[in-house]
Amino acid sequence: MNLREQNELICTCICRQTELYCEWAKRCGMSYNTMMTLYALHLEPGITQKAITQGWLLPKQTVNTVVKELQRQEYVRLEAGKDQKEKRIFFTDSGLAYAQERLGPLFELEDRALEAIGSQAAQAVVTGQLAFTAAFEREVHRGT
């Protein structure tokens, strides 16, 4: 397999994985954007909307809408950040329970998928993705 074919497979797999996350979110009765916002907040309590939009490639207005809805449902609270414009997002107790209820089964699926391929293959995926991402980032920023 040549480099072009390898890259096409990498891109196809990334897109398919995103599609599967969309499918799971829909099955759980929420949007992909809501699920990814919950996921981001689970990984980094106190994350800002800006960090979610940049790190998770979600539209700014969409993240704002999701956060406002989660706030309306009393699942999150906002606290002042370093500057007054940016608010840090935290789960409330009921929000943490909601996120665990929604994300817990997803985490179990992810874990079972990794177990199915074995620890060596899982580590190879992690190592390969980290190396490819770093090399791709260098190429994208070369000369800029």
Predicted regions and their residues:
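Residues at secondary-structure transition points
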Residues: 1-8, 32, 47, 57-61, ...
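DNA-binding alpha-helical recognition surfaces that contact promoter or target DNA
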Residues: 65
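Charged, amphipathic alpha-helical coiled-coil/dimerization segments
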Residues: 68-127
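N-terminal helix-turn-helix DNA-binding core of bacterial DNA-binding proteins
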Residues: 19-62
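C-terminal regulatory/oligomerization modules of transcriptional regulators
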Residues: 1, 119-144
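N-terminal leader segment of winged-helix/HTH proteins
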Residues: 1-28, 97
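Residue cluster at the C-terminal edge of the helix-turn-helix DNA-binding motif
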Residues: 28, 55, 71-75, 116, ...
